[in-house]
Amino acid sequence: ISGKNDGVIKPRIEKDKAAQELRSREKAEVFTPSWVCNVQNNLVDDAWFGISRRRFNTEKQDGWKTNYYPISFAETKGRTWKDYVRATRMEVSCGEAPYLTTRYDTVTGKYIPVRCRVGLLDRKLRVILENVSNGEEWIEWALIAVQNIYGYDWQGDNVLLARENILYSVIESFHDAFDMMLDKE
C-alpha cells in the first residue's frame, strides 16, 4: 500500500503503544518474541527428526546461538532433506508470521540476519542451500518450501504482512546465498 494510503498497514512494532494495546484488547492480538518462536520450532524439529538435539541453533536465555554446520539427516530413518522441505507446517493465528519466518523480532523490531533466522521457512531455506548446487535448483526447492508452509490469521492486515514477510524472506535468502537478486519472474 503506497501513495496517500502509505502507512495504513504496518508491523505491530511501528504502531504506537495505544494502538497495540487496543488490538490486544479488542482482537486478542499478542506477539511472540523470536526466542520463544525458536524454542517452539525446535520442538517441532525434535518431533520431525525423532531425536531431541538442537540442529539449527543452541537455545540461550531470551535468544539463541546459531549452529553453522550443515544439518545432518543421517538419523532420520530414511527421510531426506527433500522430505524436510516438503513437510507441511502451519502457523495458526500467524500475525506477521514469526513462526514461519523471523526477518525481525516482532516485539523489539530488531532485524535478524538471514543465517540466524529461526522460522520454519527459514530452516527449510537453509537446508535447501546446504543441499543444492546452484541458484536455479535453489529457486525450485524454495518454491516447494513455500508451498508447504501455511499461515492463518483472522486479521487481514496481518495476512498481508505475513505474506510480505514470506516473500521478502525468500528474496533475502537468495540474495544472501548467491549475492544476486531474484528475477521478477
What is the meaning of each model-derived region?
Residues 1-185:
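SAM-dependent methyltransferase catalytic region
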